C-alpha cells in the first residue's frame, strides 16, 4: 500500500519464535526499529504529494528521480520498511523448514540442493561487514542468486526480486546472541517458513 505507509501486523505473537529469536528482540525490532522506518518514510514524503501514490518498490527503483533532499531518507527508511515487511512474513510460525515446490526445484538445479544454498547464504551473511542483509533473489531472467546488501538497501534497487532475506543488523540478534552472528544465523534456519518463500517466488 502507498502513503501513508503503515507498520504491518505480524500476525503472530512476539514469543512465537522462541527459543531461536527471543520475544524482547522481536518486540523492539518490530515496534521500534520498523516503526521508525515507517514514520520517517512518511515524513520524507509528506511535502511531495505527487509521490504519495507510489509503492515503496517504485520509489526505491527510481531513487535518482526523487527530489535530492529525500533520496537518502527514502533509501534508508523505504528500504527498511520493505525489507522488514518481507522478513516478518518469512518468519511466520509453522510451514516447511526447507524449500518446497517450484522454488525447491530451482534451488536444486541452480545450487545443487538446500545444503549448498544454506552455506552460500550463511557466507553472504557472515561476510557482510557491519549492518546489512543476505538475500536469495531472482533476476529478470528467472535465475536465482545469493547476494548481500549494505544497510537497508533492497535488491529491487539492483533489478532483482527478493525471495528470502536475512537481517544481519545487530538489532536483529544482539539481545540474545550479542556479537555471535554465526549462532544467530544457525538458529534462523529453524524459523524460516519456506511455504511463504514459495509463494513469494511464484509471485516474483
UniProtKB/Swiss-Prot annotation:
Its cofactor is Mn(2+). Its EC number is 1.15.1.1. InterPro entries: Mn/Fe_SOD, Mn/Fe_SOD_BS, Mn/Fe_SOD_C, Mn/Fe_SOD_N, Mn/Fe_SOD_N_sf, SOD_C_sf. It catalyses: 2 superoxide + 2 H(+) = H2O2 + O2. GO terms for molecular function: metal ion binding; superoxide dismutase activity. Pfam families: Sod_Fe_C, Sod_Fe_N. GO terms for cellular component: cytoplasm. It is an enzyme of class 1 (oxidoreductase). Keywords: Manganese, Metal-binding, Oxidoreductase. Mn(2+) binds at residues 29, 84, 167, 171. It comes from the Bacteria. Disulfide bonds: none annotated. Binds 1 Mn(2+) ion per subunit. Destroys superoxide anion radicals which are normally produced within the cells and which are toxic to biological systems. Homotetramer. Belongs to the iron/manganese superoxide dismutase family. This is Superoxide dismutase [Mn]. It comes from Thermus aquaticus.
Amino acid at each position: 500500500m502507498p502513503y501513508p505507509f503503515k507498520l504491518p501486523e505480524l500476525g503472530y505473537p512476539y514469543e512465537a519464535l522462541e527459543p531461536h529469536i527471543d520475544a524482547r528482540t522481536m518486540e523492539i525490532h518490530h515496534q521500534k526499529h520498523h516503526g521508525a522506518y515507517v514514520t520517517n518514510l512518511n515524513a520524507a514524503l509528506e511535502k511531495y504529494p505527487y509521490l504519495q501514490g507510489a509503492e515503496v518498490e517504485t520509489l526505491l527503483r527510481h531513487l535518482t528521480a526523487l527530489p535530492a533532499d529525500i533520496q537518502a531518507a527514502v533509501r534508508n527508511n523505504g528500504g527498511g520498511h520493505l525489507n522488514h515487511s518481507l522478513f516478518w512474513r518469512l518468519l511466520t510460525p509453522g510451514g516447511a523448514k526447507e524449500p518446497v515446490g517450484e522454488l525447491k526445484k530451482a534451488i536444486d538445479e541452480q545450487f545443487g540442493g538446500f545444503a549448498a544454498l544454506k552455506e552460500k547464504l550463511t557466507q553472504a551473511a557472515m561476510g557482510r561487514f557491519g549492518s546489512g542483509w543476505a538475500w536469495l533473489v531472482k533476476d529478470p531472467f528467472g535465475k536465482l542468486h545469493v547476494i548481500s546488501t549494505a544497510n537497508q538497501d533492497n535488491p529491487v534497487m539492483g533489478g532483482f526480486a527478493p525471495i528470502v532475506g536475512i537481517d544481519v543488523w545487530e538489532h536483529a540478534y544482539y539481545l540474545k546472541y550479542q556479537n555471535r552472528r554465526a549462532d544467530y544465523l544457525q538458529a534462523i534456519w529453524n524459523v524460516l517458513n519456506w511455504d511463504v518463500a514459495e509463494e513469494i517466488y511464484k509471485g516474483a
